[in-house]
UniProtKB/Swiss-Prot annotation:
Coiled-coil positions: none
Name used for this protein in its record: UPF0346 protein SPP_0954
One Pfam family here: YozE_SAM_like
Protein's organism: Streptococcus pneumoniae (strain P1031)
Domain of life assignment: Bacteria
Family the UniProt entry places it in: Belongs to the UPF0346 family.
Length: 71
């Protein structure tokens, strides 16, 4: 069974990094409502588009999601 996207993303946290993956990891960590138990692209993408208290480049998100699928 695949780890949730959030669980995988948390391994990339690094507040000193300018890497989009590290930035998203830190933002997701601070966002209480981030979907933590899903591996569904649409659910996470919809959250980022409609409900996140932060803005994030969705093109970068698509690339990060592809890395997640390949891990």
């Amino acid at each position: 069974m695949r780890k949730s996207f959030y669980t995988w993303l948390m391994t990339e946290r690094n507040p000193k990094s300018n890497n989009p993956k590290a930035i998203l990891a830190d933002l997701a960590f601070e966002e209480a409502a981030f979907p933590k138990h899903t591996d569904d692209f649409d659910e996470v993408s919809r959250f980022l588009e409609e409900h996140a208290s932060f803005s994030f480049n969705l093109g970068d998100f698509d690339s990060i999601w592809q890395e997640y699928l390949e891990h």
